């Protein structure tokens, strides 16, 4: 993705959760090279509840922006009604996997994205997830995704998740919330 496009990660498939307390302790993400809208397939983790997730890139549109804002507002209202505070979304990522050899990198507070990309020159695109926060009814959740590539500065996205049935979540995208410098600190 180029900085000119300011892409929104649009599609998201199904997220399988089988643990009775669906909170991630750490998340493993497998990342493929992203080239001109190529689909990125993220496969099952062996250290968290089984899940599947797929991502594709797309340009933002007024209708898309409106729908994303509605989704996020709906999730926030669910949290307000349930009087339960979601998990802090500004925490550092739990885990990162890069394309080249799928080596794991467990991040620490304050870690920058530029050193990660420099250490793994074969990685065109980096994706990391933070632990989601759930409302008390267990019908909605919010989580954060952080992405970085060689062409753009790292940025954060907020996702809304809606429960479809027992153990299955539909994940929807929401608006980009921050842009960060190469140090990993929010620039907003």
Indicate residue ranges for each PLM-predicted region.
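Short beta-strand edge/turn micro-motifs at domain boundaries
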Residues: 157-181
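Flexible low-complexity loop/turn motifs enriched in small/helix-breaking residues
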Residues: 1-154, 177-188
